[in-house]
């Protein structure tokens, strides 16, 4: 790639990462301040903070990988030195997805209304189960991340750089099957939390449909609090699903780069697209939470006042 292309893509990556880190840091900071003030933290705030922190780490790792690929290609080609980056990318990737899945599950049990004994048992205990569930997500992510990182051979990154592939064509061809196997396993693992979130979304739709059949809306179109809660939860879950699909496609591009003519460019484009998911979803979560939305309005008002004061 040319110097101009490298510079442009790097600026875009840095801009995306900074916007996402700012949004996720805001979520974590607001919830942390509320925790310090009240000496306790609500389950929803704990989940949102976990999602935000995992995505801050994920965005930093993606940005670091992108910078090393462009600015330090020799370091990028050394699989042993980059194995740490691979591990933390895989770990934060799984944590981010699993924590977001926990958010979908929490919305389902808090808002939906079903009368199955198991559903009611979990619904009554969901607040007590959240911390255990988040810890289980950490353990699951670690269990998947360690084997995957070990299975990534040292030749993988050499296949990304075109100049290295010229001298290592045979080696790359030999290892393509192994790389493809790791890639397929990575994407299959991500399919399970996606399916759980999808089922949660479908059950929320079913619950909303049953709820609207039991109530009568007024002439003005007023919706009761339960209906509003259903709609808000569905918006949050569907936005996660849509952005997660985009992220998986980007992840597929990045991990399949060794099959493509311009491997380095494919990796960078994959990482740029991947940054959209954690960056965009943070602002959707802020707008979907009354607490975070009010805090953001207060911050914007203060910034606006400060800017006006500087003008005069």
Swiss-Prot record:
Tissue expression pattern = Expressed in subsets of taste receptor cells of the tongue and palate epithelium and exclusively in gustducin-positive cells. Expressed in 15% taste bud cells in circumvallate and foliate papillae but only in 2% in fungiform papillae. Expressed in gastric and duodenal tissues.
Membrane topology listed for this record:
Multi-pass membrane protein
Entry's Gene Ontology molecular function annotations = bitter taste receptor activity; G protein-coupled receptor activity
Coarsely, its chief localization is: membrane
Which Gene3D superfamilies does the entry mention?
A: Rhodopsin 7-helix transmembrane proteins
Q: Which UniProt keywords apply?
A: G-protein coupled receptor, Glycoprotein, Membrane, Receptor, Sensory transduction, Taste, Transducer, Transmembrane, Transmembrane helix
Which residues does the record list as glycosylated? Answer: 151, 167
The domain of life for this entry's organism is Eukaryota
Q: Write out the topological domains of type Extracellular.
A: 1-9, 71-101, 150-187, 257-266
Topological domains, Cytoplasmic: 31-49, 123-128, 209-235, 288-312
| Family from the record | Belongs to the G-protein coupled receptor T2R family.
Additional observations: Several bitter taste receptors are expressed in a single taste receptor cell.
Name this polypeptide is given = Taste receptor type 2 member 7
Source organism of this protein record: Mus musculus (Mouse)
């Amino acid at each position: 790639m040319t110097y101009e292309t490298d510079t442009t893509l790097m600026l875009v990556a840095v801009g995306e990462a900074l916007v996402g880190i700012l949004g996720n840091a805001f979520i974590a900071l607001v919830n942390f301040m509320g925790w310090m003030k009240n000496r306790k933290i609500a389950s929803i705030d704990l989940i949102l903070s976990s999602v935000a922190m995992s995505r801050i780490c994920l965005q930093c790792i993606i940005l670091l990988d992108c910078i090393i690929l462009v600015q330090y290609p020799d370091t990028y080609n050394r699989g042993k030195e980059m194995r740490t980056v691979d591990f933390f990318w895989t770990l934060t990737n799984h944590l981010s997805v699993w924590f977001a899945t926990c958010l979908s599950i929490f919305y389902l049990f808090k808002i939906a209304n079903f009368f199955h004994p198991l559903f009611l048992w979990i619904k009554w205990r969901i607040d007590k189960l959240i911390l255990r569930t988040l810890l289980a997500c950490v353990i699951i992510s670690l269990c998947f991340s360690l084997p995957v990182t070990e299975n990534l051979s040292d030749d993988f990154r050499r296949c990304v750089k075109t100049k290295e592939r010229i001298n290592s064509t045979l080696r790359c061809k030999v290892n393509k099957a192994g790389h493809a196997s790791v890639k397929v396993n990575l994407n299959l693992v991500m399919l399970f939390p996606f399916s759980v979130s999808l089922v949660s979304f479908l059950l929320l739709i079913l619950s909303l449909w049953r709820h609207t059949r039991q109530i009568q809306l007024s002439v003005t179109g007023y919706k009761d609090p339960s209906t509003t809660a259903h709609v808000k939860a569905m918006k949050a879950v569907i936005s996660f699903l849509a952005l997660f699909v985009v992220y998986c496609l980007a992840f597929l591009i990045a991990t399949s780069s060794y099959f493509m003519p311009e491997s380095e460019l494919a990796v960078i484009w994959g990482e740029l697209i991947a940054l959209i998911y954690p960056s965009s979803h943070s602002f959707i979560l802020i707008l979907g939470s009354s607490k975070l939305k009010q805090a953001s309005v207060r911050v914007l008002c203060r910034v606006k006042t400060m800017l006006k004061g500087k003008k005069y």
